[in-house]
Amino acid sequence: IYNRAKKLHIDTEVRRVVFIVETNREKDGNELEKIRGIFGGKSKDFVTAVDEKNIILVKEVKNGEGYDELTKTAQVIVDMLNTEAMTKVHVAFGTIVNEIKEVSRSYKEAKMAMDVGKIFYPDKNVIAYSRLGIGRLIYQLPLPLCKMFIKEIFDGRSPDEFDEETLQTINKFFENNLNAVSYTHLRAH
């Protein structure tokens, strides 16, 4: 990977992060071109399509930039594609890596952030791997363990059988990142 990077004049020891942009329709090329229009002109950032619905941006992260700036960058992508391309998108990003060989890890983290975000944070358009919280832990649990837990807790009952107050409490629990203190506060009121 280092030899290939050298041939292509790509710095190997630069801070980078991977963004995944997922559209909810088959690409007509418009979304990819819009993102390339913003980031592709910079020789330090790379934009490519992975499949019909996913675009990847490997962005250089300057010294002093952190996750707040990356969240703003992701929001710019969402806003631009929502207004100009008139398509709803979700953007997820991994952690900042320091070497080119770690870019694949940032991609895997961004992919997991996208998957976990769809399950635990469906209303969010921007999902950061570093801010997944306990949703990431739950997502990584083995399926048999989850099924066993659900069977023990719900004892054969369907979530459709719960009253509205219980469902609201469960939703608030998830909205507060499964924070037990917030949950206790909700139950007190």
Model segments located where?
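Cytosolic nucleotide-utilizing catalytic cores of signal-transduction proteins
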Residues: I1-R187
